[in-house]
């Protein structure tokens, strides 16, 4: 039987099984079924075990969702946690999109799924309550979120020394093993076009995983082949030199730091060098101190602040967490665990992460998600304090991007233009350093009657700015972000005229 026939049979059996409901995998997998029959039964049982029927406080939806663990190293007992949402319409025809957040050490469930582009957002309520996101990316694709590496969120290892060996290489390999095994669990999606997207330190994760898939596909068996078509990264850490240079320049240009501090950093820091002098560190400490009173990740957004009756602060308050000054292994913004909050006119809630952590630590939520099966000894958090060591991180991802462009993969880079951590200035410097030929220079793109941002089309790469968005573009500009992913997946240019 051909692979497409097997996948079709699995999908049909899957649908029939839900109609029958009571049929067990053991009954379906009899001695007379043969290898294919038992394979279908095992797949069916695994999918049924991961099916999320309903979450506490969830509004009714018509799409299916799944969550659970996929083992990536049996010897060490390493398993990564995922959450998967079928597309709202025609999931059998839509691509599969994997979303990764950065850190390193931060959860794609907490940021990506629950606060940016997933279908459900936890709300501030005494009882569990989820709000349906009208701009969820599962309107465009079958949407997969992964907590990676182990030690992040609900992902775990039974070998404690694994935590001390984490780095870019291990993360890419484990994520690749996850995908190979996940597609075995969901073979009906194996022939679909597959894309990877992410933000921040996923500027490392996404290209490295894409390159590993590209290389492994050359030697992989048919059952392990991954149908990778492209990648998209936003406000991405790409190159140490240009990222640091652009970060300082953006802060000065946007009136965050003084002339004197700007000149002090430029005088004492050579961002081309790996070693940092004491004078440079001192200057950068002064620079990061400024962001204790501002949201570095969205320059014009309010911070989550404590009320006068509850002035206690959390270890995860961005303003109170030391900010690494060099080599940029920096966790995305964490929000205060305080009751006080303010809202922007557009509805952005700077304390959204507080609601997410409260929701994800509920026992009934974890049971519904088939999560925390090992009963981890610490609460679920957006960014893991367990991941405190990082063994390898290349100074530049530009060589990897060149490889992927040369391989013919679709590559898009986007940038929210109010992010101070990996600002649009830094990304523009990085792409200039990449050295690709410009096909169409600085061009406005539109979302209805308004300018959504600007594009630069390179030979093999598309650069898109998103006007008024911070580090987490889908959080601040959800409509524009959904438009962006639709056009990326459709391989279409963004509209250059109002509509």
UniProtKB/Swiss-Prot annotation:
It comes from the Eukaryota. Ubiquitous. It is an enzyme of class 3 (hydrolase). Probable carboxypeptidase. PROSITE patterns: CARBOXYPEPT_SER_HIS, CARBOXYPEPT_SER_SER. It comes from Arabidopsis thaliana. Disulfide bonds join 106-383, 269-280, 304-351. InterPro entries: AB_hydrolase_fold, Peptidase_S10, Ser_caboxypep_his_AS, Ser_caboxypep_ser_AS. This is Serine carboxypeptidase-like 34. Belongs to the peptidase S10 family.
